[in-house]
Structures are given as structure tokens and as C-alpha cells.
Amino acid sequence: MKPMTDSRKIRAWHFTDGMFLRDGQPLVVGKTYTYAGWVKLCESGLHASKRPIDALQYAPGNVVSRVECGGEMLNGDDKLVCTERTVLWAYDAEKVLRHFARLCALDVIHLWDAPEIVVQYLRTGDEDMRAAARGAGAAAWDAQNKRLVRMLREGRPR
């Protein structure tokens, strides 16, 4: 796939682990980072995603940046790579991401018999309930493992 140079800028999302890029450079709002070289998805260039949910799967940390990408660019299914990426704004989104994760879990809570403490934590985000919810989740995981062991033993070839 050949990179295309486009005068059009694309707004995208990028996550970092703290206020530093993977190469150790500080993440500076307002700065345009440039890459000199061939762009190749997953290998070289400055990466970002058009949708934040796609960017999350590549996120090394909780700091989210809204970026504007330009220069030579390649578009993939869930990310892009470019030679110019300007940081428009950035902040530590841990609270937002935790809230989003709890809402996603609540969307499917009806699919299992969740312990009440887990449901309460997911609904409230109360950090005091978090350790208890984790313990209840671990107990449920252990029970599921016992069930799986039993089923695998019963279903094994004889």
C-alpha cells in the first residue's frame, strides 16, 4: 500500500502511558510531531485511530490525546499512520475509562448471575466496594473453573 500525501487533515485519537510518547519524547499539547521515513501500519510512523474505541486496543496507558494527522498517510481498518501528528489536547482519562468500562459491563450484566456487590460497584463506582467486588468476581471465576474441570473430565474420550 502506497502512502498518500493529502492536504486534508484527519482528526484522530491517540493514547499514551503518561505524558510521554513511546520513544520517550514528552507529550506536548500544541506540538506537531514529525516522522521522516516510510510509513507502514504497525511498524513505522505516527499512529492514531479515527475512533477512540479503536485506539483503546493499542493504548499503553490512560492519557488520551485528540490529534490532527497529516502529511503522508496510510489508513487501515482501525488505525492510521502518518508523518505529521499535532496534539490538540490531552489529559489523564482514567476516571472516564473506568466509568465507560463499568457501563459496558452493566450492558451485559443480565447474562450472568453477578454477585450483588459486583452490581453495586458497577452502578456506583464506589472504590470501597471495588476490592469486595473483585473478591466476589474471583470466587465466581473459581466456581466457573470447577464447573469446566468437571465438564471436561466427563466429556473426555474413553
Where are these regions (language model features)?
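Short, glycine-biased loop/turn motifs at secondary-structure junctions and
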Residues: 1-158
